């Protein structure tokens, strides 16, 4: 179940993080490359934060999700289901 809380998406089952990792790997994009692309879009994120998001130990922010969706060229549905 997903909740939007103060521009953070609460994903108790880590659906989003797992999907980000799966899609990123399917597209051959490394964590460092994704972080670089996010930072070029002025998204404040570190590799450590991405590792935590993918591992379900940190909630993703709405602006991070939006930018990751654009970089990976997928729909919100691909990330949320």
PLM ranges: what are they?
Residues 1-27:
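A short, Lys/Arg-rich alpha-helix, primarily the initiator
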Residues 61-78:
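DNA major-groove recognition helix of helix-turn-helix/homeodomain DNA-binding modules
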Residues 28-52:
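Short alpha-helical DNA-recognition segment
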Residues 20, 31, 47, 62-65:
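Helix-turn-helix DNA-binding elements, focusing on the entry/boundary residues of the two helices
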Residues 55:
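Short, conserved catalytic or interaction motifs in soluble domains
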């Amino acid at each position: 179940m997903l909740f939007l809380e103060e521009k953070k998406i609460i994903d108790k089952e880590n659906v989003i993080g797992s999907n980000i990792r799966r899609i990123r790997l399917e597209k051959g994009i490394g964590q460092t490359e994704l972080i670089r692309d996010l930072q070029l879009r002025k998204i404040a994120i570190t590799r450590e934060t991405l590792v935590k998001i993918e591992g379900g130990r940190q909630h993703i922010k709405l602006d991070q999700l939006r930018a990751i969706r654009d970089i990976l060229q997928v729909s919100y549905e691909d990330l949320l289901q």
